[in-house]
Amino acid sequence: MINQLRIYTIPPDNKDHFLDRFRDHAARIMARYDFRILSMWTDERNSQVKFVYLLAWDDAADMDAGWSKFMADTEWSDIKKRTSEEQGDFVLGIEDLILTPCAFSSALGGDQ
């Protein structure tokens, strides 16, 4: 299993619209392609708004296949286009990290 950490920098004025779109549309469509979202957070320090979420994947091939299907989804493309036209920019930047646990780290949930 691998974990993927996604960090989106979002315009402060669009925070609520972004979160609504993610909750109502992105997460639902991601579930269609077997995305396992473990948790989601926001960080609003330093005059920036960041949306952070952690995913679990079986392996890199599973992750790549899931993202390819999600990005090719016509419903998601239509939603992104429509909401961006109505509300403006939703994402200013994306940081994508693939996390490998250290040998001395406990697994998520505290299991060894």
Indicate where each model-derived feature is located:
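Intrinsic disorder/low-complexity detector
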Residues: 1-9, 45, 61, 69-74, ...
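An amphipathic, aromatic/His-enriched active-site/gating alpha helix that lines ligand/cofactor pockets
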Residues: 17-38, 58-97
